[in-house]
Regions:
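Active-site beta->alpha N-cap acidic-glycine motif
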Residues: 1-87
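C-terminal active-site subregion of NodB/CE4 polysaccharide deacetylases
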Residues: 1-29, 34-40, 103-212
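Glycine-enriched alpha-helix->loop->beta-strand junction motifs that scaffold or abut catalytic
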Residues: 48-51, 87-91, 147-153
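Conserved SAM-binding loop
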Residues: 50, 54, 97-101, 121
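Residue-level signal for pocket-adjacent positions within structured domains
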Residues: 56, 71, 96, 164-167
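Active-site-proximal loop/turn and secondary-structure-junction residues that shape catalytic pockets
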Residues: 58-60, 95-97, 137, 160
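Histidine/lysine/aspartate-rich catalytic loop segments that bind and position anionic ligands
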Residues: 76-111
Length: 212
């Protein structure tokens, strides 16, 4: 999704805000911590008065991801993450090493979750209570470990049966490459689920903040 489409989507979402107890119907959230979160997404969100949650894989801070297509995606620095937090955006964990949590032994799982949370709290000087499961994969063991590590809300991609729905908040993909992305967003807003948009390799995820 190019920046123009992202701006139009944010404009659309801002116009859909219903005020009252829920300032907006949806909160944009961003996985992986790419630099374009800081350079592009955050300024556009601020322009339209939209909130946002940025989920960071802490082992990758200041480094880069290599995508399957061979692209190098730079990850935000500590200073950038701190600045986002100071600007009023929420910071969450996307795991430490961006690995499948469901494949980890219990001890490693607990250590990875706690480490990521500790690193982020040290950077921003605030509590970090939200987690986005890497690759959207989870099971009840991962949910329990996340809760024990201090997370009170966790985001998947697709939902599922879980004892605590706050720990498996679903997200519905909407590809920005399709001409119908705005129509899909409109339908999703009426049904109040989560919408996912893509800005280059940036993953924008929108989720209702209320009644969770």
């Amino acid at each position: 999704m190019d920046t123009g489409k992202f701006r139009r989507l944010c404009h659309f979402l801002a116009d859909s805000g219903n005020g009252g107890e829920c300032y907006h119907n949806f909160i944009p959230t961003f996985d992986d911590g790419y630099v374009d979160n800081f350079d592009i997404a955050a300024p556009v969100l601020k322009e339209f008065g939209l909130p946002g949650i940025f989920f960071i894989s802490t082992a990758m801070i200041g480094r880069h991801f290599n995508t399957p297509a061979g692209n190098r995606m730079e990850v935000m620095s500590r200073a950038m993450i701190r600045e986002l937090s100071m600007a009023g955006f929420a910071i969450g964990s996307h795991g430490h090493e961006h690995s499948y949590l469901i494949r980890m032994a219990s001890i490693e799982l607990s250590e990875q979750l706690k480490k990521s949370r500790d690193i982020l709290e040290n950077i921003i000087g605030k509590q970090v209570t939200e987690l986005s499961y890497p690759f959207g994969k989870w099971d009840e063991r991962v949910v329990a470990a996340a809760r024990t590590a201090g997370f009170s809300r966790a985001f998947a991609v697709h939902g599922g049966s879980c004892m605590d729905p706050r720990m498996v908040i679903p997200r519905i993909p909407v590809s920005g490459e399709r001409e119908t992305y705005m129509e899909k967003a409109a339908v999703s807003l009426k049904r109040r689920p989560i919408v996912m948009e893509t800005l280059n390799f940036l993953r924008t995820l929108l989720t209702p903040p209320c009644n969770l």
